[in-house]
Amino acid sequence: MNMKLPVNDVKFVNDKVSKYWNENQNELKAYFHNKLMGVKGEYQAALNNPYDTSVFKKHYSNGDVINNTGKFRSFLRLPLGYNALVLPLNKTNVGFELFSEAAYKLKVARKIGNKLTKDHIFGVTEVGVHIFVEFMNSGWDWKYMCDEWLPNNLELFFTCRILKSEHQKEDDNDTNGVARGEHTLEQKMLLEHYKEIGIPLPLIVVN
């Protein structure tokens, strides 16, 4: 693990995530493999659907899930965005959580209440689409995806505890709220979508 996200204790995060992978890699790879094969099977079945030859164009983005909307594109957030890891990267499994500065201050003051939410830093739809395209472009090479891609991209599944007011607009005049679908994964790795709404960096690691 080579952490690229701006956090205040990179070594700690690298060590914890490496330990998580080393201790659970067979279970993680087995489950990820099943998720990959599921979306591959559905996509390929849509190519030659016996009931409606237009279903691929209408609901599977005509093969271009990066640029075209569609039910399958949206669906990818479930098996690959939310649920690709059988053991989520939460405090129970990796021994830490990420907080924005404002969220951390509430935690220290013990005033969290219902003011915080967990934000999927990279966006579950974006991550789901990215994984599917990587898998497809690899020639459906599940071994590469499980043995090489997954351990080198675990940070795509990180969440961060932020204020609800940082997470989404409270009304039409609110200038806060993390932008959705406006940044590349590379920009999100630098947390540009957080910086734009005034969330200070680095994120705070709490064990």
List each model region and its residues.
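Nuclease and nuclease-like effector domains acting on nucleic acids or nucleotide cofactors
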Residues: 1-113, 175, 185-206
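Residues that cap or delimit alpha-helices
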Residues: 25, 139-141, 163
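Short, well-structured alpha-helical interface segments that form or flank functional binding sites
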Residues: 67-70, 113-116, 154-161
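Histidine-centered nuclease catalytic patch
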Residues: 110-152
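A structural signal for short, well-ordered beta-strand segments and their strand-loop junctions
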Residues: 117-118, 159-164, 202-205
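Hydrophobic/aromatic-lined pockets within catalytic cores
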Residues: 126, 164-171, 195, 199
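Short Cys/His-centered divalent metal-binding micro-motifs
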Residues: 151-183
